């Protein structure tokens, strides 16, 4: 059985509430509850400490998105609104915003090189069919050349549910390193400085 078949039957597995809700020294959990207008997007900044980037070992950034669109059980496209996310690194927010903004078909889209778009598993083709999406970017080498800020782009795309003008959603991000390094305090300080 392949990963897609297992996920289709079992979902993302059994929840560990404590693991999902709390951080520890080498694993940080961040979340936001928000809403987006149809055919709009939001960019969330994710601080990535130097210690996480350069310390040897396996490190992951896991993004999970959940939303509650109107549904019809009698349609092939049963979900009335589509949502998706991407994890981008090494780019300025202005370039990301320009890339994802809605534009006329004849207008060129500024490119974001593949090296700046984090490869996540499962990929977008598999996960975007669902109202609960989760994917992980895994890094094994030094990633400091991409900078200390990554960005999560959350998009909301109108479907057949024309009576809806905004869609609620929640997003959770887990930043984790297999080495027992102190990233919680570093991320917390950077978030408090912004707040």
Where do the model's predicted regions map?
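Secreted peptidase-domain scaffold signal
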Residues: 8-95
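Generic intrinsically disordered, low-complexity segments enriched for polar/acidic and small residues
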Residues: 9, 19, 28, 97, ...
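C-terminal edge strands of extracellular/lumenal beta-sandwich accessory domains
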Residues: 79-93, 138-195
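Long, low-complexity, intrinsically disordered terminal regions
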Residues: 113-136, 144-158
């Amino acid at each position: 059985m392949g990963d897609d078949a297992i996920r289709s039957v079992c979902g993302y597995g059994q929840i560990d509430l404590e693991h999902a809700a709390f951080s520890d020294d080498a694993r940080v959990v961040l979340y936001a509850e928000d809403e987006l207008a149809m055919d709009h997007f939001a960019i969330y900044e994710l601080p990535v400490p130097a210690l996480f980037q350069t310390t040897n070992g396996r490190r992951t950034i896991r993004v999970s998105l959940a939303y509650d669109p109107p549904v019809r059980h009698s349609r092939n496209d049963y979900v009335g609104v589509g949502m998706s996310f991407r994890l981008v690194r090494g780019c300025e927010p202005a370039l990301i915003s320009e890339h994802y903004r809605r534009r006329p078909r004849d207008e060129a889209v500024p490119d974001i090189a593949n090296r700046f778009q984090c490869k996540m598993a499962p990929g977008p083709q598999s996960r975007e069919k669902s109202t609960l999406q989760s994917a992980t970017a895994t890094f094994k080498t030094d990633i400091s050349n991409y900078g200390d800020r990554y960005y999560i782009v959350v998009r909301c795309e109108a479907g057949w549910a024309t009576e809806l003008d905004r869609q609620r959603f929640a997003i959770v991000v887990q930043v984790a390193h297999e080495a027992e390094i102190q990233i919680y305090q570093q991320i917390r300080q950077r978030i408090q400085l912004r707040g």
